[in-house]
Amino acid sequence: METPEALFEKARQRALEARLPYAGALLPDEAQALLQSNVGARLVDVRTKAELEWVGRVPGAIEIEWNSWPGSQPNANFIAQLQAAVPAGTPLLFMCRSGVRSHNAATAATQAGFAQSINVLQGFEGDKDTLGQRNNIGGWRKTGLPWTQS
């Protein structure tokens, strides 16, 4: 298993290569390893309440919607809810369905002073396959990481 330092460095290198506006990016298994490493990192799941209920959730994740459902309206209280949930120095791993909303959330968190914001690439459900379906290529669930369904 990689050390937390090696995982942070891997995340940082990806951020530099992709010119990301936040601290880094990790694959789901790397994110889980960092969460288990006891460095105080927290997973922030930014999917909608509907997604959490119908698709599945990660035990122990902080759940703050980036957009609401229905209507996909931006959560105007996202940063305030994040600030209420964790101290600014906490390493945060942002995850959504596929990595787009979590990219935006990590960007906003960084701008709000959460300097250790990391995007979880592939998200919970992964990328679409050739048939346009998720959960077959990458993602938290496909990788076999902990999750539950209502």
Regions found by a protein language model. Give the residues of each.
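Short, surface-exposed ligand- or partner-binding patches at beta-edge/loop junctions that are enriched
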Residues: 94-95
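Structural scaffold elements adjacent to functional motifs in cytosolic proteins
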Residues: 43-45
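Rhodanese-like catalytic fold shared by cysteine-dependent sulfurtransferases
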Residues: 1-40, 49-91, 102-150
